[in-house]
């Protein structure tokens, strides 16, 4: 499964929450369009979106559930129940928050549920320590997804964390570059820095965000 992703682009099809494109049928269409454009894998949020997409594509799907847990900053597949539901819906790979942030269901329990369900586990990490712990516990994929999004790693830099990506390369495991790789040049640089694959989201599937980038550039040029 991971060999099918190696050297390729993963399209994260996650429309803006509650926006006009936030519907399972539209997410599935986005997924088909990105595969037609050359994506070798998909990252799909939500069980309903995953169920709508799975029958329409034959590329590997990374499934996640995003939800606010209230008593925890963890938002990505933060419960055992969510991990199991994603596997039942057809996820080949389940990504989960592998940081040390407090949560009700321990990250070890979530990882165990993914592996027990027969899926591949992807650890969404913020630090090298997160990745090391995830790999030792059985995760096959380590992603730079959460660098810059935790209290420990918060930064004003709006670019990707290439330093972390390079450190991941030395750890073993399948390295997924993810998080602010929003131009073709940055995606290519990620591969040169040692990524096995690159995930791109907002620049491909969040039209409101992309439109705002262009609109702001035009306004500021007046």
Question: Which residues are covered by each model-predicted region?
Answer:
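Conserved N-terminal beta1-alpha1 strand-loop-helix module at the mouth
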Residues: 1-84, 88, 129-136, 181, ...
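Alpha/beta catalytic cores of nucleotide-metabolism and tRNA/nucleoside-modifying enzymes
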Residues: 16-21, 161-222
